[in-house]
Amino acid sequence: MKKIFLILFFIIFSTNLYASNIKKVYFAGGCFWCMEESFDKVKGVIETISGYSGGHVKNPKYKDVVKNNTGHYETLEITYDSTITNFEKLLEVYWINIDPFDANGQFCDKGESYKSVVFYENNDQKKIIETSIKNIENRFNRKVVTYVKNFKEFYMAETYHQDYYEKNFIRYLMYKKGCQREEVLNKIWG
C-alpha cells in the first residue's frame, strides 16, 4: 500500500511540477506559417499553434481576418518549457524574424491582420518588451512600429493552417521566397 501511495504521490507531484514549467506566449509577425517555422526550431518550444488574437470577433475565420473585418492579427501561440527557454529568449527570436519598422504589415503581406504585435500577460513581460524595443530603436536609430498589446484571447486558426510549412513544403517555400522574407531579414538583422 505504501508503494502505491508513493507512486501516486510522485505522479501527482511531477505532473504539477511539469505543468508549472509550461508557459505560453503570443506573437503576431505577419504570416503565421513563417512564424511557426521559426519557433518550431527553438529549443524548449513544445508546440506552436497558428491563430488569431487582438480583435473583437469571437471565433474568427481566416477569410474575415484577412479582410480586416475582425480586428484580429495572425498570431502564433507558443507553448514552451520555462526550464529550457524563457520569454526574453523567445522575444529575441521574434524580433529577428520580423521587420519591426514596417507599419503596413510584414514582407509581402500588407494590411491590419499582418501587422506585428507582441502580446503581454503581465507587467513584467510588458517592461521586458518596452526595454527590448528601446534597445532596437537605439541600435537602428529608427522607430519600432510593432504594437504592444495586453493579451486577451487566442483563437486557433483552421486546421489547414497548422504546420503549413511542413504539410505544403514546396508551396510554402515558393510563398516565402516570393515575399523575399529572408532577404529583408538579412538586410535588417545581418
Locate each region found by the language model.
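Sec-dependent N-terminal signal peptides
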Residues: 4-13
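Flexible coil/turn and secondary-structure edge motifs
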Residues: 18-190
